[in-house]
Protein backbone atom coordinates (compact mmCIF):
# COMPACT_ATOMS: atom_id res chain seq x y z
CA UNK A 1 0.00 0.00 0.00
CA UNK A 2 1.37 3.40 -0.97
CA UNK A 3 2.12 5.71 1.93
CA UNK A 4 3.36 9.19 2.72
CA UNK A 5 5.09 10.04 5.97
CA UNK A 6 6.23 13.59 6.65
CA UNK A 7 8.99 14.33 9.14
CA UNK A 8 10.53 17.50 10.45
CA UNK A 9 14.09 18.07 9.36
CA UNK A 10 15.05 18.15 13.04
CA UNK A 11 12.86 15.31 14.41
CA UNK A 12 13.69 12.19 12.47
CA UNK A 13 11.76 9.56 14.43
CA UNK A 14 8.35 11.12 15.14
CA UNK A 15 6.28 11.76 12.00
CA UNK A 16 4.36 15.00 11.63
CA UNK A 17 1.81 13.33 9.32
CA UNK A 18 1.13 9.92 7.79
CA UNK A 19 -1.42 8.53 5.35
CA UNK A 20 -2.02 5.56 3.09
CA UNK A 21 -4.91 7.27 1.29
CA UNK A 22 -3.88 7.94 -2.32
CA UNK A 23 -5.96 11.12 -2.60
CA UNK A 24 -4.49 12.56 0.60
CA UNK A 25 -0.98 11.62 -0.53
CA UNK A 26 -1.53 13.30 -3.90
CA UNK A 27 -2.92 16.44 -2.25
CA UNK A 28 0.04 16.81 0.13
CA UNK A 29 2.61 16.16 -2.60
CA UNK A 30 0.91 18.25 -5.27
CA UNK A 31 0.93 21.18 -2.84
CA UNK A 32 4.74 20.88 -2.86
CA UNK A 33 4.97 20.59 -6.65
CA UNK A 34 5.40 16.81 -6.66
CA UNK A 35 3.15 14.85 -8.98
CA UNK A 36 1.72 11.66 -7.51
CA UNK A 37 -0.94 9.62 -9.27
CA UNK A 38 -2.29 6.09 -9.24
CA UNK A 39 -2.11 4.55 -12.71
CA UNK A 40 -2.94 1.05 -13.93
CA UNK A 41 -0.01 -1.36 -14.05
CA UNK A 42 -2.19 -4.19 -15.27
CA UNK A 43 -0.05 -6.00 -17.85
CA UNK A 44 1.23 -9.51 -17.19
CA UNK A 45 5.00 -9.13 -17.52
CA UNK A 46 6.02 -12.62 -16.45
CA UNK A 47 8.99 -13.39 -14.21
CA UNK A 48 11.88 -10.90 -14.38
CA UNK A 49 10.76 -9.21 -17.61
CA UNK A 50 13.18 -7.73 -20.12
CA UNK A 51 13.19 -3.94 -20.44
CA UNK A 52 11.75 -4.18 -23.95
CA UNK A 53 8.81 -6.22 -22.64
CA UNK A 54 8.04 -3.58 -20.01
CA UNK A 55 8.35 -0.70 -22.47
CA UNK A 56 6.11 -2.43 -25.02
CA UNK A 57 3.50 -3.22 -22.36
CA UNK A 58 3.32 0.38 -21.14
CA UNK A 59 4.10 2.37 -24.28
CA UNK A 60 0.65 3.96 -24.01
CA UNK A 61 1.53 5.41 -20.57
CA UNK A 62 4.91 6.63 -21.80
CA UNK A 63 3.27 8.24 -24.84
CA UNK A 64 0.84 10.08 -22.56
CA UNK A 65 3.69 11.61 -20.55
CA UNK A 66 5.73 12.43 -23.65
CA UNK A 67 2.75 14.22 -25.21
CA UNK A 68 2.03 16.07 -21.97
CA UNK A 69 5.56 17.09 -20.95
CA UNK A 70 7.79 16.55 -23.98
CA UNK A 71 10.04 13.95 -22.36
CA UNK A 72 12.76 12.67 -24.66
CA UNK A 73 13.85 9.27 -23.41
CA UNK A 74 12.87 6.41 -21.15
CA UNK A 75 14.22 3.16 -19.82
CA UNK A 76 13.46 0.52 -17.23
CA UNK A 77 15.09 -0.06 -13.88
CA UNK A 78 14.42 -3.48 -12.44
CA UNK A 79 16.18 -4.85 -9.39
CA UNK A 80 15.74 -8.12 -7.57
CA UNK A 81 17.17 -9.47 -4.34
CA UNK A 82 19.59 -11.71 -6.25
CA UNK A 83 21.27 -8.79 -8.06
CA UNK A 84 24.99 -8.93 -7.20
CA UNK A 85 25.21 -5.11 -7.30
CA UNK A 86 22.22 -4.47 -5.03
CA UNK A 87 24.28 -3.20 -2.08
CA UNK A 88 26.34 -0.79 -4.19
CA UNK A 89 23.24 0.50 -5.99
CA UNK A 90 21.35 0.95 -2.73
CA UNK A 91 24.26 2.89 -1.24
CA UNK A 92 24.46 5.12 -4.32
CA UNK A 93 20.75 5.96 -4.37
CA UNK A 94 20.67 6.55 -0.58
CA UNK A 95 22.90 9.60 -1.00
CA UNK A 96 20.93 12.83 -1.21
CA UNK A 97 21.07 14.25 -4.72
CA UNK A 98 19.27 16.47 -7.19
CA UNK A 99 18.69 16.37 -10.92
CA UNK A 100 18.55 19.10 -13.52
CA UNK A 101 15.28 17.59 -14.73
CA UNK A 102 12.16 16.04 -13.24
CA UNK A 103 12.64 12.50 -11.94
CA UNK A 104 9.65 10.56 -13.24
CA UNK A 105 8.96 6.96 -12.24
CA UNK A 106 6.03 4.66 -12.97
CA UNK A 107 6.16 1.58 -10.75
CA UNK A 108 4.88 -1.48 -12.60
CA UNK A 109 6.06 -4.04 -10.02
CA UNK A 110 7.21 -3.99 -6.42
CA UNK A 111 8.01 -0.94 -4.31
CA UNK A 112 10.60 1.67 -3.37
CA UNK A 113 10.86 4.63 -0.99
CA UNK A 114 11.41 8.13 -2.38
CA UNK A 115 12.54 10.60 0.30
CA UNK A 116 12.17 14.26 -0.62
CA UNK A 117 13.96 16.99 1.35
CA UNK A 118 11.71 19.99 0.84
CA UNK A 119 12.44 23.09 2.90
CA UNK A 120 12.56 21.96 6.54
CA UNK A 121 10.70 18.68 6.05
CA UNK A 122 11.33 15.20 4.68
CA UNK A 123 8.54 13.53 2.70
CA UNK A 124 8.92 9.76 2.58
CA UNK A 125 6.81 8.39 -0.26
CA UNK A 126 6.43 4.62 -0.39
CA UNK A 127 5.74 4.02 -4.07
CA UNK A 128 4.29 0.69 -5.11
CA UNK A 129 2.88 -0.93 -8.21
CA UNK A 130 0.52 1.52 -9.97
CA UNK A 131 2.23 4.65 -8.60
CA UNK A 132 3.50 7.46 -10.78
CA UNK A 133 5.74 10.02 -9.10
CA UNK A 134 7.44 13.04 -10.61
CA UNK A 135 9.98 14.78 -8.41
CA UNK A 136 10.61 18.32 -9.70
CA UNK A 137 14.05 19.26 -11.00
CA UNK A 138 16.32 20.58 -8.27
CA UNK A 139 14.50 18.83 -5.40
CA UNK A 140 16.98 17.19 -3.00
CA UNK A 141 16.01 13.56 -2.51
CA UNK A 142 17.20 9.98 -2.11
CA UNK A 143 15.75 6.58 -2.91
CA UNK A 144 15.69 3.42 -0.82
CA UNK A 145 15.10 0.11 -2.56
CA UNK A 146 15.53 -1.91 0.63
CA UNK A 147 18.07 -4.62 1.40
CA UNK A 148 16.14 -7.14 -0.71
CA UNK A 149 14.98 -5.06 -3.69
CA UNK A 150 12.06 -6.20 -5.78
CA UNK A 151 10.78 -3.56 -8.16
CA UNK A 152 10.41 -2.59 -11.78
CA UNK A 153 9.85 1.02 -12.75
CA UNK A 154 9.80 2.92 -16.00
CA UNK A 155 12.09 5.95 -15.82
CA UNK A 156 11.22 8.90 -18.04
CA UNK A 157 13.65 11.72 -18.80
CA UNK A 158 13.89 15.21 -20.29
CA UNK A 159 17.54 14.55 -21.01
CA UNK A 160 18.31 11.93 -23.68
CA UNK A 161 21.38 10.94 -21.63
CA UNK A 162 19.15 9.55 -18.86
CA UNK A 163 19.83 9.56 -15.11
CA UNK A 164 22.35 12.24 -14.12
CA UNK A 165 22.66 13.14 -10.44
CA UNK A 166 24.33 15.97 -8.59
CA UNK A 167 25.09 14.70 -5.09
CA UNK A 168 24.63 17.27 -2.31
CA UNK A 169 27.10 15.79 0.17
CA UNK A 170 24.46 16.12 2.92
CA UNK A 171 24.23 13.01 5.13
CA UNK A 172 20.58 13.73 6.04
CA UNK A 173 19.42 10.39 4.60
CA UNK A 174 21.29 8.55 7.35
CA UNK A 175 18.98 10.01 10.00
CA UNK A 176 15.65 8.76 8.63
CA UNK A 177 13.94 5.36 8.65
CA UNK A 178 14.74 3.05 5.76
CA UNK A 179 13.12 0.04 4.21
CA UNK A 180 14.16 -3.27 5.75
Curated annotation (Swiss-Prot):
The keyword Transferase does not apply. The record marks 102 as: May play a role in transmitting local conformational changes. It is an enzyme of class 1 (oxidoreductase). SUPFAM superfamilies: RmlC-like cupins. Binds 1 Fe(2+) cation per monomer. Binds 1 nickel ion per monomer. Fe(2+) binds at residues 97, 99, 103, 141. InterPro entries: ARD, ARD_bac, RmlC-like_jellyroll, RmlC_Cupin_sf. GO terms for biological process: L-methionine salvage from methylthioadenosine; L-methionine salvage from S-adenosylmethionine. GO terms for molecular function: acireductone dioxygenase (Ni2+-requiring) activity; acireductone dioxygenase [iron(II)-requiring] activity; iron ion binding; nickel cation binding. Pfam families: ARD. The record marks 96 as: May play a role in metal incorporation in vivo. Ni(2+) binds at residues 97, 99, 103, 141. Keywords: Amino-acid biosynthesis, Dioxygenase, Iron, Metal-binding, Methionine biosynthesis, Nickel, Oxidoreductase. Pathway: Amino-acid biosynthesis; L-methionine biosynthesis via salvage pathway; L-methionine from S-methyl-5-thio-alpha-D-ribose 1-phosphate: step 5/6. The keyword Acetylation does not apply. The record marks 105 as: Important to generate the dianion. Belongs to the acireductone dioxygenase (ARD) family. PANTHER family: ACIREDUCTONE DIOXYGENASE. HAMAP family: Salvage_MtnD (MF_01682). Catalyzes 2 different reactions between oxygen and the acireductone 1,2-dihydroxy-3-keto-5-methylthiopentene (DHK-MTPene) depending upon the metal bound in the active site. Fe-containing acireductone dioxygenase (Fe-ARD) produces formate and 2-keto-4-methylthiobutyrate (KMTB), the alpha-ketoacid precursor of methionine in the methionine recycle pathway. Ni-containing acireductone dioxygenase (Ni-ARD) produces methylthiopropionate, carbon monoxide and formate, and does not lie on the methionine recycle pathway. This is Acireductone dioxygenase. It comes from Enterobacter sp. (strain 638).
